[in-house]
Every structure is written in structure tokens, then in C-alpha cells.
Amino acid sequence: MARIAGVNIPNHKHTEIALTSIYGVGRTTAKQICLAAGVSATAKIKDLNDAEVEKLRDEVAKLQVEGDLRREVTMNIKRLMDLGCYRGIRHRRGLPVRGQRTKTNARTRKGPIKPIKASK
């Protein structure tokens, strides 16, 4: 099992698909990485030699992935919350940020329904 950017890459998958297991690398980026490294996107990871895996490592190292990217996203959200702007307030309250309706739906973001206790 190859290890790229601190992530174990599955051996049995095609290179393009296997690279998507790295946080911050999607299908398009994976194709670009394979093209830049000169590695076939359809070759399986187990069939690649050490030199090809090293080329992939070098290409991924040029990108902002995994911990650095997660940290940046977290800091961006924290910055919005500290500013007190509309998006920051929505993040703070745990509500949808991008204008979705909340009268109905939005249960994923709002959490389970809290029942109203009947008063006697």
C-alpha cells in the first residue's frame, strides 16, 4: 500500500480513483496529477513502480492537501464567525449558510427535532 501525503492509498484501485482518498484531491485534480507525473490514470497503484509513486508524491506535495487544507478551511470559518457577518452568525448558530430554507427541511444542519413538552 503506497503512502502519499500521509494517507494510505488503496492498492486495488486505479490511480485516478485512489488519489481521491487524499483530502483536497478530487477526480479532476487526480487526473491533472497523473498527467503531470506522467503516470497512467487507469493503472492500478499496485502495478506502479517506486519511481512512479515518488513522482505522484512530488506532484501532490505541490498542492495544499490534508491537514493544511483542513486547517485553512477551519480558520476561514472561524474568521467569518469572529467578524460577526451573516455567514459567520449562521455558522455559529448551526444553521444553513448558503440561503437554503429552514422553515421545513435543513434537518441535517439543525439536528434532530426537539419535541415540545405538553404542559398540564
Swiss-Prot record:
It holds the Pfam family Ribosomal_S13. One of its GO terms (molecular function) is structural constituent of ribosome. The keyword Magnesium does not apply. Keywords: Ribonucleoprotein, Ribosomal protein, RNA-binding, rRNA-binding, tRNA-binding. One of its GO terms (biological process) is translation. SUPFAM superfamilies: S13-like H2TH domain. Belongs to the universal ribosomal protein uS13 family. Part of the 30S ribosomal subunit. Forms a loose heterodimer with protein S19. Forms two bridges to the 50S subunit in the 70S ribosome. Located at the top of the head of the 30S subunit, it contacts several helices of the 16S rRNA. In the 70S ribosome it contacts the 23S rRNA (bridge B1a) and protein L5 of the 50S subunit (bridge B1b), connecting the 2 subunits; these bridges are implicated in subunit movement. Contacts the tRNAs in the A and P-sites. NCBIfam families: uS13_bact. This is Small ribosomal subunit protein uS13. It comes from Methylobacillus flagellatus (strain ATCC 51484 / DSM 6875 / VKM B-1610 / KT). The gene is rpsM.
